[in-house]
Regions:
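Hydrophobic helical h-region of N-terminal Sec-dependent signal peptides
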Residues: 11-18
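Bacterial lipoprotein signal-peptidase II cleavage site
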Residues: 25-31
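C-terminal motif of bacterial Sec signal peptides marking the signal peptidase cleavage site
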Residues: 20-23
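Histidine-/acidic-rich catalytic cores in large beta-rich domains
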Residues: 32-367
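Bacterial N-terminal signal peptides that target proteins for export
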Residues: 2-11
Length: 367
């Protein structure tokens, strides 16, 4: 059965909804493509793409380049998926296609990458704790938002970003107080600027653990993992609380197309899918459910749900040991293990580029 027409109708409906919510539109030529990111990959290998862009900063080789890759791992290695990946412990963005790294972007020795997106126009949006930025395939910076880096009462951090259409970006600033912002990157206007509740005594040294992967949903609500206090909260567009779910250390919370929420709990090595009633419909504990030979050496921080129902877990790894990415089926069968410490370091975020969806439309990319 050909499901593309059905999918495209759903995509058009969501485009209309998000356009209403955000005041921006995705061009029809791109919205008509089920996998728009695949259509722009040639821009990353074009003749005008420099080896080092004017705003790139050299990143030294990873610490664990001598890590050994075990033989006979499930799946196709780097050829399993075309993908965009970043990791907390390394200083490059990697773009992979047909089993090869086809493009990188170096940001020098700095603090952690936590979020990354390829948009349908080929631009890359990422967060680097001290800032968030959007760059073009030929490595030009089109937008950047810098945090207050100096320690003290004004110190801020960014651990999450999300494109809202092609003209707007949502970020969460950990700080005193923490704030959620939606910024029009074309005009510079801050269109949403709201203080997020965080019920701990103000502590400039404690902002790092406040919030992680926050997402705007297709309904215009905000799904916020309160990492430091152990719950996920959902706010309506006016920031009234409409849903809460308690879990030990929620690093990421992603609203799925089926209406459920996929939550990654770093402390308990757990990824859990819950329905709107808070009932568990699926969960995977990497300590208990992974075979011994594929055990992560560092708990997953994020999970990506694919259109085929599979789930990909990321791991920062430890000292060049253990896998960085693992894909499992709904019945918990391992179908892919990536363990490559020669080309990569730990991995915190992955976007699979041939999965259906327009990334800048909320919920279409379930990562």
């Amino acid at each position: 059965m050909n499901t593309k027409p059905i999918y495209c109708l759903a995509a058009i409906a969501v485009v209309s909804l998000v356009a209403t919510l955000t005041g921006c539109h995705t061009p029809a030529s791109r919205s008509a493509s089920v996998t728009p990111c695949m259509n722009v990959l040639d821009r990353f290998t074009a003749a005008n793409v420099p080896e080092m862009g004017p705003d790139e900063t050299f990143a030294p080789a990873g610490k664990w380049t001598n890590g050994v890759t075990p033989p006979n791992l499930p799946g196709k290695g780097l050829a399993q998926h075309p993908m965009l990946i970043v990791g907390e412990n390394y200083d490059k963005i990697f773009l992979v296609d047909h089993g090869k790294v086809i493009w990188t972007y170096s940001t020098g020795t700095s603090y952690e990458y936590d979020d990354v997106w390829m948009l349908s126009n080929g631009n890359i949006l990422f967060s680097r704790m001290e800032y968030a930025a959007e760059i073009t395939p030929d490595k030009k910076v089109v937008w950047r938002y810098d945090c207050h880096k100096a320690p003290g009462i004004n110190h801020t951090e960014i651990h999450t970003c999300q494109p809202i259409g092609l003209d707007k970006v949502m970020i969460v600033l950990n700080g005193l107080p923490p704030r959620l912002k939606i910024i029009n990157i074309k005009t510079g206007a801050v269109e949403v600027d709201h203080e997020l509740p965080f019920s701990e005594p103000p502590n400039p040294n404690g902002i790092h653990g406040q919030f992680r992967r926050t997402r705007l949903t297709a309904q215009g609500t905000y799904l916020v993992p309160v990492f430091g206090l152990g719950y996920v909260v959902e706010y309506d567009k006016n920031f009234n609380e409409i849903w809460r779910y308690y879990i030990k250390s929620p690093w990421a919370a992603v609203r799925l197309k089926n209406g459920n929420t996929l939550i990654t709990d770093e402390a308990d090595n757990l990824t859990r899918e819950v329905n709107p009633k808070g009932e568990t419909v699926w969960e995977f504990n990497t300590k208990k459910d992974l075979p011994a030979e594929y055990q992560f050496t560092s708990a997953p921080q994020t999970a990506t749900r694919l259109a085929n129902g599979d789930t990909i877990f990321t791991s920062r790894g430890e000292h060049g040991k253990g896998p960085q990415l693992i894909e499992v089926t709904p019945d918990k069968r391992v179908v892919w293990v990536l363990q490559d410490w020669k080309d990569f370091n730990g991995i915190t975020a992955v976007q699979v580029l041939d999965d259906p969806g327009i990334p800048e439309i909320p919920v279409q990319s379930e990562h």
